[in-house]
């Protein structure tokens, strides 16, 4: 046996998160030198990561976080739900959010090249490789977003299904509308709107919807067809547009009415500037 103690073996395992067998192999290869063993394991991780890159990654988590300057959003995928709930993997994702907020990056490439806050001696992509060795699965950073914080604004975050679906809402007109912003984010996850408002629906989407409706009511007088099309189009807007949808917590209120009521009560002029809905693999 090489000249290293159980305490050194334990320290190496704690520092790297790698299994005892690999840690022992590293210490034996490096003559018991802890620092060299860490480097050995990192190189081993980078090498073994390449062998896993081709594996499918259909599971994972979506996570979001805000600070005083902005909001970070990320999707990271792995092979199995078991690893998606692994503490090491979740810590890795949590630190990725910190990196996005620190560097204000909004692409996978920019994030991957940045120095990791979890281990500044490694880039994010190098740490991804080391983490792949630890959890034994391919890890893929699928998408990244960063939203700078606007003046007098509030961001709401709602996560569902242990990170399988996440919604963000950006409200203008108030910096203290946290409860409202989170309620609307929760509503977005439940109702899954396609558009913010009627005005934001593309003309081609409206034209396509009219074609579908018209094909269902052929043979009726033109004035009747026009009334039916108008009615069905309004139903389409109520289903597809966030501001038109009935609030999930109180169907008597539309989301627009909910915002109007808050604005009157708070004396502010609140509006939804943007909403984002991410689902794993979508």
From Swiss-Prot:
CDD domains: UBA_EF-Ts. One of its GO terms (molecular function) is translation elongation factor activity. Associates with the EF-Tu.GDP complex and induces the exchange of GDP to GTP. It remains bound to the aminoacyl-tRNA.EF-Tu.GTP complex up to the GTP hydrolysis stage on the ribosome. It is found in: Cytoplasm. This is Elongation factor Ts. Gene3D superfamilies: 1.10.286.20, DNA helicase RuvA subunit, C-terminal domain (1.10.8.10), Elongation factor Ts, dimerisation domain (3.30.479.20). Belongs to the EF-Ts family. InterPro entries: EF-Ts_dimer_sf, Transl_elong_EFTs/EF1B, Transl_elong_EFTs/EF1B_dimer, Transl_elong_Ts_CS, UBA-like_sf. NCBIfam families: tsf (TIGR00116). Residues 80-83 are annotated as: Involved in Mg(2+) ion dislocation from EF-Tu. Its main location: cytoplasm. PANTHER family: ELONGATION FACTOR TS, ELONGATION FACTOR TS, MITOCHONDRIAL. Keywords: Cytoplasm, Elongation factor, Protein biosynthesis. GO terms for cellular component: cytoplasm.
